[in-house]
Every structure is written in C-alpha cells, then in structure tokens.
Amino acid sequence: MSPASPTFFCIGLCVLQVIQTQSGPLPKPSLQAQPSSLVPLGQSVILRCQGPPDVDLYRLEKLKPEKYEDQDFLFIPTMERSNAGRYRCSYQNGSHWSLPSDQLELIATGVYAKPSLSAHPSSAVPQGRDVTLKCQSPYSFDEFVLYKEGDTGSYKRPEKWYRANFPIITVTAAHSGTYRCYSFSSSSPYLWSAPSDPLVLVVTGLSATPSQVPTEESFPVTESSRRPSILPTNKISTTEKPMNITASPEGLSPPFGFAHQHYAKGNLVRICLGATIIIILLGLLAEDWHSRKKCLQHRMRALQRPLPPLPLA
C-alpha cells in the first residue's frame, strides 16, 4: 500500500461523517405568539418562528384553510375571526427542510359575551374544605375553560346546559388566587367568549396576599393544555405542570437546543478539517521520506557496484 492510501482513506471517512451529520433531519423550530395566543378581537399579535442561526428560508403557515408566508414572523394588526386557528412553521437550509414546529392555537376572545364565575358555598374557604367554581354562560356552549393567575395550564371541562362546575377538593394554600373562565362551542374551538370577571378565592386561616387581577396575556394556551385534565376525581390541581408553552413575553432568547446542535456540528466540521490537514501533511512527509530513502538506496547501490576492468594496453 502506498503512503498516500491511508491519507485518502481517512479523508474519505472524515468527509462521509461530515455529510452524514449535515444531511440528518433538521431540528424543528419553535412558534410563539407575542404577547399571547389569547387575542381579543381588534387587538394585534405577532407570530414568530425561531430556529437555529443562518437559516436560508422560513415558512409560516396556517392550517385549514391552508395558506403560508415565506418569512419568520406574521404580524396581525387587527385580530379577526378569520385569523383564529392552528399555525405551524418550518425552515430550509440548503435543499433540506426541517421538521414542522409544534402547532400553535391562536384563539380569538371576545367573540361572545362573557360568562359569570362564582364560588360555592363561598369564595372564602377554610383550609381543608371543598369548594366548587361555577362558570355559567348566557349561551348553550358545551366547552368551558378555567384559568388561575400564575398557572401556565388551564382546566377544561366539556359540559352542557350553559354552565360547568370545577370542584376543588380539600382546599390548600396553593388554591388561593384569582380565577376567570371562558366559554365556547366545540364546533368553533378557536372562537371564545370574553373572559369572566375575576374571582378571588381566599383560603382562610392563612396569611396569604391575594394576587393581582390577571390579564389575558398571563394565560398562554397550548393544544395540550386545552385538553381535559386527566384527574380521577375531576378536581383542580395547582401542582400540575404543562408540557408545552407556546405564548411567551417579548424578547425571549432562542431555544438552547438549536444553538447547541449548531455549535456541535460546527465543532465536528472543524475537527474533521483539522484532522484532514494533519493527515495530509503526515502523508506528504512520509511520501517525501520514502522518495529520499529510495534515492539514497539507488546511490548506495551505484557506489557498491564494481568498477569495469581497465582496458589492456
């Protein structure tokens, strides 16, 4: 085997590794609504797609009816009913498209009159007792959503006959706070009522300070959080943590995973290129040494060769 063979073999392996790394599936971006995915009619909202650095092209699309824009954000100056629905985004690097982002549900609120929210038997509850929060709508809606200020999740109950009950079993200090509810029809899941007036639940016997009145921006909604809570006794739990959060405040930094993957790929490329250069230099040195050795051997053989006999006088 010639000295250059291992060099080209190592170069081939390195280049193949780089190609495999770069041709794998691109990580999915994140899609966020700013300031919130709950948008009152007439208000503005920005949908922003965030991916890794140096993206060639972004695509932001609305599902059903399908339409898209080749940009990383969508500004809606005035929220209308037609803007509500499911959105997702993706990006392109070279000839490869990324996986689509998680779907974001953009909700139009204030489409219908607000429901009323009350606590029974009272909004002042002794610790350890039970209380039921009742959300009642003037319309025959079959879906109700309850929010607690400070919680990122929501509690959803499919009900009929204009109202829904949200029982809280064995009240603790964690249940104190400000609540409000929405109502809507399952046939139009992205068109919600206006929020109810806030209800402050006070757990007596505790030195807890009531929370401030919430705003709609405090309540991000995700596809997972709008599903019914999986609780055996249908009680509200403030310890439940959501799986995903699609709405976020202004100025959120890009996800760490994208930068980490991009940095790792860049490191791998640099390491392979550095190793390739070193291997090439070693191969050239070995080939030069081999050539010099052969030349020296030829000279030695020439010196050791017997001289021809002298011609006879």
UniProtKB/Swiss-Prot annotation:
Which loops or segments lie on the Extracellular side of the membrane, by the record?
A: 22-265
Q: How does it sit in the membrane?
A: Single-pass membrane protein
- The Ig-like C2-type domain, residue ranges: 27-105, 115-197
**SMART domains associated with the record:** IG, IGc2
Q: Which cysteines are joined by disulfide bonds?
A: C49-C89, C135-C181
> What is its subcellular localisation?
Cell membrane
Which keywords accompany this UniProt record?
Blood coagulation, Cell membrane, Disulfide bond, Glycoprotein, Hemostasis, Immunoglobulin domain, Membrane, Receptor, Repeat, Signal, Transmembrane, Transmembrane helix
Q: Which residues are glycosylated?
A: N93, N244
Record-level GO cellular component terms: cell surface; membrane raft; plasma membrane; tetraspanin-enriched microdomain
Q: Does the keyword Repressor apply?
A: no
GTP-binding is among the record's keywords? no
Q: Main localisation, per the record?
A: membrane
Biological processes, Gene Ontology terms: collagen-activated signaling pathway; collagen-activated tyrosine kinase receptor signaling pathway; platelet aggregation
Q: Where is this region: Disordered?
A: 213-236
- Regions of this protein lying in the Cytoplasmic compartment: 287-313
Provide the tissue specificity.
Megakaryocytes and platelets.
* Region forming the signal peptide: 1-21
The record ties this protein, via Pfam families, to: Ig_2 (PF13895)
Which GO molecular function annotation, any one, does this entry have? collagen binding
List all membrane-crossing ranges.
Answer: 266-286
For the null mutant, the annotation states: Mice deficient in Gp6 show a complete protection against arterial thrombosis and induced pulmonary thromboembolism, without significant prolongation of bleeding time. Mutant mice deficient in Gp6 and P3h2 are born at the expected Mendelian rate and have no visible phenotype.
Share what the entry says about its subunit structure, partners included. Answer: Associated with Fc receptor gamma chain. The GPVI:FcRgamma complex is associated with the Src kinase family FYN and LYN. Interacts with TRAF4. Interacts with COL1A1, but not with COL4A4.
Physiological role: Collagen receptor involved in collagen-induced platelet adhesion and activation. Plays a key role in platelet procoagulant activity and subsequent thrombin and fibrin formation. This procoagulant function may contribute to arterial and venous thrombus formation. The signaling pathway involves the FcR gamma-chain, the Src kinases (likely FYN or LYN) and SYK, the adapter protein LAT and leads to the activation of PLCG2.
Q: What is this protein called?
A: Platelet glycoprotein VI
Q: What is the lineage of its organism?
A: Eukaryota, Metazoa, Chordata, Craniata, Vertebrata
Q: Which gene encodes it?
A: Gp6
